[in-house]
Amino acid sequence: MKSKKSKSTNNTIALNKKARHDYILQDKIEAGIELQGWEVKSIRSGKVNLSDSYVTLHKGEAFLVGSTIQPLNQASSHVVCEPLRQRKLLLNKRELDKLIGSVERQGYSILATAMYWKKNWVKVEIYLGKGKHEHDKRDAVKDRDWARDKERMMKHKV
């Protein structure tokens, strides 16, 4: 019998942690991403940065903007590597229509929060979100501190 390969539990490539702090995230959508060969090699080695990345809509298509994929040192010399290029996201028509409607009518932003492996494909987790005001951010910090203090008090009581 063949033994099965052990699957790694962590398929995450990159995270955008600042998005949760700066935006109220609501609807999650999983999107495929169109990549070039050198980009896949760089992603496998973990040279990806998603901070300050967002999604723009142009002519009925979605593009990931602001993400950085650094080329490897041994990349081919005949291929021009653009670390900051726009990358097309692969979405269904229904998902695109939902995104277009939310952005145009309701003033939402589309943010990339994570990049991960799903089988052999690179997927991007995108969210519809509204920007937080400064007082919303302070309230979130206050709530988080209170929850931590409450846990600490309950732990010492028992």
UniProtKB/Swiss-Prot annotation:
Q: Name one GO molecular function term.
A: RNA binding
- Pfam families named in the record: SmpB
Question: Cellular component per GO?
Answer: cytosol
The Gene Ontology biological process terms listed for this entry are: trans-translation
Q: Which domain of life is it from?
A: Bacteria
InterPro entries in the record: SmpB, SsrA-bd_prot, SsrA-bd_prot_CS
Q: What keywords sit in the KW lines?
A: Cytoplasm, RNA-binding
- Reply yes or no: does the keyword Cytoplasm apply: yes
Cell location: Cytoplasm
Name the SUPFAM superfamilies for this protein: Small protein B (SmpB) (SSF74982)
- Describe the task this protein carries out: Required for rescue of stalled ribosomes mediated by trans-translation. Binds to transfer-messenger RNA (tmRNA), required for stable association of tmRNA with ribosomes. tmRNA and SmpB together mimic tRNA shape, replacing the anticodon stem-loop with SmpB. tmRNA is encoded by the ssrA gene; the 2 termini fold to resemble tRNA(Ala) and it encodes a 'tag peptide', a short internal open reading frame. During trans-translation Ala-aminoacylated tmRNA acts like a tRNA, entering the A-site of stalled ribosomes, displacing the stalled mRNA.
Report the family membership.
Belongs to the SmpB family.
Protein name as catalogued: SsrA-binding protein
